[in-house]
Curated annotation (Swiss-Prot):
The name this protein goes by in its record: ATP synthase subunit beta
Reaction(s) the record says it catalyses: ATP + H2O + 4 H(+)(in) = ADP + phosphate + 5 H(+)(out)
Pfam families: ATP-synt_ab, ATP-synt_ab_N, ATP-synt_VA_C
Annotated signal peptide: none
Keywords, ordered alphabetically: ATP synthesis, ATP-binding, Cell inner membrane, Cell membrane, CF(1), Hydrogen ion transport, Ion transport, Membrane, Nucleotide-binding, Translocase, Transport
InterPro entries assigned: AAA+_ATPase, ATP-synt_VA_C, ATP_synth_F1_bsu, ATPase_a/bsu_AS, ATPase_alpha/beta_chains, ATPase_F1/V1/A1_a/bsu_N, ATPase_F1/V1/A1_a/bsu_N_sf, ATPase_F1/V1/A1_a/bsu_nucl-bd
Topology versus the membrane: Peripheral membrane protein
Amino acid sequence: MTTGKIVQIIGAVVDVEFPQGSVPRVYDALNVVDAKERLVLEVQQQIGGGVVRAIVMGSSDGLRRGLTVENTGAPITVPVGTKTLGRIMNVLGDAIDECGEIGAEEHYSIHRAAPSYEEQANSTELLETGVKVIDLICPFAKGGKIGLFGGAGVGKTVNMMELINNIALQHSGLSVFAGVGERTREGNDFYFEMQEAGVVNIEHPEESKVAMVYGQMNEPPGNRLRVALTGLTMAERFRDEGRDVLLFIDNIYRYTLAGTEVSALLGRMPSAVGYQPTLAEEMGVLQERITSTRSGSITSVQAVYVPADDLTDPSPATTFAHLDATVVLNRNIASMGLYPAIDPLDSTSRQLDPLVVGQEHYDIARNVQSTLQRYKELKDIIAILGMDELSEEDKQVVSRARKIEKFLTQPYHVAEVFTGDPGIYVSLKDTLAGFKGLLAGDYDDVPEQAFMYCGRIEDALENAKKL
C-alpha cells in the first residue's frame, strides 16, 4: 500500500503527491492516515509529476499540508446485501443511525459498469400507484424510470412519500432510498414514518424492507455527488439476487449541482448556465446503471427539482431523455389548491399506448387531456367576454373540464397529519370508471364542488347529497 503527502488543499479538493512509479488510478480511494475521524479522498485527476487531485468525502476541516495519505488501490466500496436493510448509511456505507456496525459480508465498488445490452430486459407490466392522475395519464411500468419534476414547494417530496407508501408497502420486494442533498429533517421524518409503517424494524433489522443512504444538504459536494451511486450499488446487489427493487432518489438535481461544484473546484471550464461540461456524461453513467436485467428489476422514482420552474434548464432537460414516465408538478395547479398538483397535460408515459394499457384506458386518458386542453384554450375568452359568449358545446366542455380538474385531486395518506382527511388508495378500475362517466356526461347535474378531494366516483355522489 503506497503512501503520499498532501501538498495543496482548496476547500473540498485536495492535491496529493505520490512517488512517480505508484500514482493512484482515477477513482481510487485514498485514506488520510492522521485524520481524527475516517476521511476518504477519491482521485479525480492525475495532474502529472506524481500529483493527483482528489475530492474529499467528508469535511476538510483540520487537514493540513504534509499529512500522510494511503492509497487503497481500489475504488470506494460499500456494504451490500440484507445487512443494509433497516439501516441508515452515509456515502461510504458507514452506519449513521447509532445502531452499531453494518457487519455486511460483502462490499461492492460504487463505480460499476452498466449491464450489457444482452443482459437487459424490458417490461410492459404496469405498476398501480393508487394515485388517480398518475394511473390514468402517466402509468408506471415495473422496471421503469420515473421522474417527478417540480419547482420549490409544489410537492415533489410529498408525492414521492405517497408513492413509497402506496407502492413499497403493497410491494413484496425491497426498497432503497437515496437522500441526495435534501433536508435532514425530511430524512428524519421518513425514517420514523417507515418505522411506524413497519417497513423498518429496529428490533429485527433483517425483517426490514428498506435500506437508506443519506448525503444531506449540509455535507460537502463529494458526498452529495457519490451518495446516489452508493444507493444504486445496494439496489443493484438486490436486483442481481433476482429480486424486484424500488429505488427512490430525492433529489437528482442536487446530484447535478454537486457535480457542478466539484467541476468548478477541479478547474474545468463551465458550460451552459454554469453547469459542468460533463453534465450529460455524468447523468448517463448514473441512469444507464438503473436498469432491469433478466435476473431482476429496478424500478426507480426520482425527484427532479426544476430551477425557477424552467423545464428547459440543462439539468432537468438532460434528465428527461432517460425516463420512461415524467410526472410534472405545476405551480398554477398548486395555487388553485388542487393537490396533487400534477399537470395532466405536461405529464407523459411511454406506457400510455393502446397495446400496453388497452384501447379503453388510452381513449379515456386522451379524451380527458383533450377536454382539459380545450378548457385551457377557452380560459382567455372566458376572462375577457365571460361564460355567456360561449357556445352550448363549449359551455359543456368547460363544465366537464372543471369537474375533471376537481376529480383529479385526492387526499394522501402521508398528508393526513396536515389535512385531517384520511388518505385514499384508488384502484385503476375505479379511476377509469369515474372518468369514463364524467366524459360521457353521466354526472353533468352533479355540482363540481362534490368532486373535490374524493376517491371513487361513488364518494363524489355521496358528497353531492351533503351539499
